[in-house]
Amino acid sequence: METRKIIHVDMDAFYASVEQRDFPEYKGKPLIVGGPPNSRSVVSAASYEARKFGVRSAMPCSKAAQLAPQAIFVFPRFEVYKEVSKQIREIFLEYTDLVEMLSLDEGYLDVTFNKKNIPYAVTIAKEIRTEIFKRTELTASAGVGNSKFISKLASEKNKPNGLTVVLPDDVISFIDPLPVSSFHGVGKVTARKMKELGIYTGKDLRTKSIDELVQHFGKMGIYYYKISRGEDERMVQSSRERKSLGAESTFDRDKLDYDDLLKQLKDVAVVVERRLEKKDFAGKTLTLKIKFYDFSLKTRSKTLSEPIFKADELYSTAIELFEEFFEIKYGKKSAIKAIRLLGISLSHPNSENEDPNLFLNL
């Protein structure tokens, strides 16, 4: 069987780089794409100059302003980013029809059998990066491997403007030293739990039996067992249509307080808005997910007359669904029982199957 050749291409600080390209006065300066510095908006993108101060995507703009008070804040121009993204996708399609765009600024290509009959994936990756720069004046990083998991990890290895190739025989040696927190599917809470179990790196994860991992992480334990060995059979899906998108947050401590939980719900709504904008997605059906301290799970949904994607609309709709889970205790509004996780997702009303990646960890 032919060894798969998968490329993951990820644009470097995409939104911020587009702004620095279009407005030369921003070049070389810490630039933050998002809302005003004194708002509850989150950072959509940060230039590498801003990242040196600790600014990261999804961070509240107010915190970013504290870390980098000299930074320039600009509002996102999503229509411009979408046009550039189309240019990038057109380049991908010159090599293969097996292109899976994950967002405006990144995608997978399966070039095992490609249109130009180029035998080496690394050659294609080099050509694509060169062509992207020629047509858009933007840089991209790329990773080459035999699976989605490996190629994505590889693309993150030498950013910005880097290329990393992981040969099949080198997969284990590549994974072993990496922190598990860098693995897709390992969020902050899971990474913390893994550390409590003595799992810090890919090698640590690989020493655990499948039974141990399932015991601690449920069915996700099987996934962790496989990726620690570089096993990922997911195909590049060129025709994938996203039906839903959301985010969830697991708390360090279970929560009862109404006001505290509303703040957490607002934070989730803000992150969902950012992801919806990045994926160019809107939907009519909002689903609220609540997991209690005893791991019991409740979901409630509401279908609206028009598609929504803004944080305030998500938040106000989620609150309506949230109210039934509260009661007045000793004159104070509290949850009916302690809550450990909140999630919000948005989907089309005709979605029959829930996207397995519907709720992504914050």
From Swiss-Prot:
Q: Give the co-factor note.
A: Binds 2 magnesium ions per subunit.
Can you cite a GO biological process for this protein? DNA-templated DNA replication
**Reactions performed catalytically:** DNA(n) + a 2'-deoxyribonucleoside 5'-triphosphate = DNA(n+1) + diphosphate
Active site residues according to the UniProt entry = E106
Which residues of this protein are annotated with the site description Substrate discrimination? Y15
UniProt key word Disulfide bond: no
- Specify the UmuC domain's residue ranges: 6-187
| EC number(s) per entry | 2.7.7.7
UniProt GO MF annotations: damaged DNA binding; DNA-directed DNA polymerase activity; magnesium ion binding
The residues listed in the UniProt record as binding Mg(2+), with positions renumbered to this chain, are D10, D105
Highest taxon listed in the record's lineage? Bacteria
Q: How does it assemble?
A: Monomer.
**Family listed:** Belongs to the DNA polymerase type-Y family.
Q: Give the function comment from the record.
A: Poorly processive, error-prone DNA polymerase involved in untargeted mutagenesis. Copies undamaged DNA at stalled replication forks, which arise in vivo from mismatched or misaligned primer ends. These misaligned primers can be extended by PolIV. Exhibits no 3'-5' exonuclease (proofreading) activity. May be involved in translesional synthesis, in conjunction with the beta clamp from PolIII.
Task: Please state what the protein is called.
Answer: DNA polymerase IV
Q: Which organism is it from?
A: Leptospira interrogans serogroup Icterohaemorrhagiae serovar Lai (strain 56601)
Name the gene that codes for it: dinB
